[in-house]
A protein has these predicted regions:
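A solvent-exposed interaction/effector surface
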Residues: 1-151
């Protein structure tokens, strides 16, 4: 697995975020949330430009959000999607290069590294930022940033 094991401290920017939220085990909720989000994205694109694809998740209560960063604030999103401003903040960033099927293993390793390195976390969403477009990028060349909220 091609995962950076030394994190980079970054300040994640504020994001106008449109998403589908699911609760429960991520192995079931993540694919379901992304399926709905992708289905609804065509309606979203009729009114907004998508800047980024990203998921936000909390491990404790098992909240998973699949969604899109858009260019600015909005009062209207397609039915089935929610909108909020994600404030961003300080994060420790790890980078996975390879297929999305490695994300569960990579995320587990990231949380092991957080403990081993003594990274102090704050209570906020973790982020998966999907850097390359999977429609045009071979799976082994996909890049995903895994970011943990850092105190």
């Amino acid at each position: 697995m091609n995962l950076t094991e030394t994190p980079e401290i970054v300040h994640w920017p504020e994001v106008h975020y449109v998403f589908v939220e699911k609760t429960g085990p991520f192995m079931q909720t993540a694919p379901a949330a992304w399926g709905e989000a992708h289905r609804l994205s065509q309606k979203l694109l009729q009114q907004h430009r998508i800047d980024r694809y990203m998921s936000l998740y909390r491990v404790g209560p098992q909240i998973y959000r699949a969604g899109f960063g858009i260019e600015g604030p909005t009062a209207h999103v397609p039915e089935g999607l929610r909108y909020e401003v994600f404030p961003g903040g300080k994060y420790s960033r790890f980078v996975l290069t390879g297929p999305y099927s490695l994300l569960p293993q990579a995320s587990g390793r990231v949380f092991e590294l957080v403990q081993q390195l003594g990274i102090e976390l704050r209570d906020d969403f973790n982020i998966e930022n999907y850097v390359k477009d999977p429609r045009v990028t071979p799976a082994e060349e996909l890049v995903t940033e895994i970011l943990v909220p850092t105190a």
